[in-house]
């Protein structure tokens, strides 16, 4: 009876389950998305206080302004604080931060759909939502730390 030698099992060099490696294009995509969803929310959040890029108050739906206490300007301070926190969570725990950013983007999209003339911005934010979901999927492979350690 002939004996066969089994070939060693190797993983594909771009398997997301492998150790993080900067030569791995899947890991590179994770790094790019993580950096983008760390920096952008923090910068946009800070700008809610400074108004350097734009007057953010115009992006707050008048319907919501009637419901939320205070003015649109005051609401944007809260929005800015939430965005800064979201960016920091992505930096520290991308698996959970990406879900926070995705949920936040859904809220932004709904808000923009309530303002006539901002549908193009809502569509762009939908693209960002999809990228945040992609970051969550990649973080599931590369950020395997549990939320709470025992």
Label every PLM stretch briefly.
Residues 2-150:
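Membrane-interface extramembranous regions
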């Amino acid at each position: 009876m002939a004996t066969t030698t089994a070939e060693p099992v190797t993983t594909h060099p771009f398997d997301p389950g492998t150790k993080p490696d900067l030569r791995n294009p899947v890991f590179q995509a994770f790094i790019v998305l993580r950096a983008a969803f760390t920096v952008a929310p923090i910068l946009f959040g800070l700008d809610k206080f400074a108004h350097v890029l734009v007057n953010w108050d115009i992006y707050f739906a008048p319907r919501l302004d009637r419901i939320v206490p205070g003015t649109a300007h005051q609401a944007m301070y809260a929005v800015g604080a939430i965005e800064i926190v979201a960016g920091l969570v992505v930096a520290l725990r991308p698996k959970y931060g990406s879900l926070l950013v995705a949920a936040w983007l859904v809220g932004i999209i709904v808000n923009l759909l309530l303002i006539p003339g901002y549908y193009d911005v809502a569509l762009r934010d939908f693209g960002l939502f999809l990228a945040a979901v992609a970051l969550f999927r990649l973080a599931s492979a590369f950020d395997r730390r549990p939320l709470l350690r025992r």
